[in-house]
Swiss-Prot record:
Organism this protein belongs to: Pseudoalteromonas atlantica (strain T6c / ATCC BAA-1087)
Localization, UniProt: Cytoplasm
EC number: 6.1.1.22
Annotated InterPro entries: Aa-tRNA-synt_II, aa-tRNA-synth_II, aa-tRNA-synth_II/BPL/LPL, Asn-tRNA-ligase, Asp/Asn-tRNA-synth_IIb, NA-bd_OB-fold, NA-bd_OB_tRNA
Main location per the UniProt record: cytoplasm
Known catalytic reactions: tRNA(Asn) + L-asparagine + ATP = L-asparaginyl-tRNA(Asn) + AMP + diphosphate + H(+)
Similarity-based family: Belongs to the class-II aminoacyl-tRNA synthetase family.
Protein name: Asparagine--tRNA ligase
Highest taxon listed in the record's lineage: Bacteria
An MF annotation (GO) of this entry: nucleic acid binding
Amino acid sequence: MAQAPVADIFAGKYSVGQQVTVKGWVRTRRDSKAGLSFVALHDGSCFDPIQVIALNTLNNYADIQRLTTSCSIIATGVLKESQGQGQSLEIEADEIEIVGWVENPDTYPMAPKRHSLEYLREHAHLRPRTNVIGAVTRVRNCLSQAIHRFFHENGYCWVSTPILTASDTEGAGEMFRVSTLDMMNVPTTEQGQVDFSQDFFGKETFLTVSGQLNGETYATAMSKIYTFGPTFRAENSNTSRHLAEFWMIEPEVAFADLSDIAQLSEDLLKYVFKAVLAERADDMAFFAQRINKDAITRLEKVIEQDFVRMDYTDAIEILQNCGKKFEFPVSWGVDLSSEHERYLAEEHVGAPIIMQNYPKDIKAFYMRINDDNKTVAAMDVLAPGIGEIIGGSQREERLDVFDRRLAEMGLDQEDYSWYRDLRRYGTVPHSGFGLGFERLVAYVTGMQNVRDVIAFPRTPGNANY
């Protein structure tokens, strides 16, 4: 008999009295003096397990009484309305096949108790079996599907940009080098530098920090594209907001200015928040109960509110005059820290903010210079409860201005010759943004650390599994 997902059973896709087969892992087992056992089976398809009733008339009932957490079983039986509290349906088993035992349950790392998130990170290969990481995984999947659906419905083309690259999109130099050279016998040039001409690609190559530059090449032909893939930053940052490997969503739109891309960011966030509240109500209820009591209400507020547009210069004035003492002093020309962003979004406005027009000296080389020659057409979306969640800009499409910007930042034109071609052959105003997927998942779930919303976190000193 085909497997019946537990989620489908609870969704009413199977009728009471129908015989079903469920496959999964034991969460708990409770034995009754009346000669039966109650087995909570979980298959990952939804938050709740389904109760399987095993009568002592089953041939292998003695083995069933030995079941412990995470033993794998296949149970076939009749679906019934539950007489007990806490569940609406249960299965009275005609047969229970024990597929896999847990070796030495006393030392099993995921024993049925509440573990700290730090402990779970140390057992990342087993933590999907817990309520919290299982719920995170389903919400992450829901958000991913909703993002693809949003762009598909709005006429965007999904482009897979390269992971291996010779370009530094951010111009910050915090990149992972990729090489097949023998580290014990590195070839050198006459000047004593590493001779990358003998490397696999014949030049110095890195893991990508962003798909943006490659995405722009397709936006200037396909009009509207987006990328959704892994990116890498060699930042030695041990914080709750940073990962060395993470996923980014990066739309690029031709004939779009900063206002257009700001509206796109608002539309995207509202769309995916609506989707997760509708499709993962069980998991979101868990997060509201156990992780952050505002997990649901703050998403609802974002959906209902208009995002507030604010200029960076105005924000600095607000911060300087608010009377609040910040850890990091505020002045025009400094990058806003998380405490500044959260004050503005949570206390001053009480709604998401789209911060615009930042000083050019704190932003990347590809952002369009404004007429004041001091600021760039850049924007960040600041969300209450987390701060920056999206960063984007109108791209500099004027070749002469772009070349001056490269020179100002000490970047070599030759390294960006193909990128300059976009400005030489049919240049067009275009804009885009980057949305860090893990930060989005953390915001939605209320999880405080991005290491807990990605399967196997990569951080300084940690590349396990």
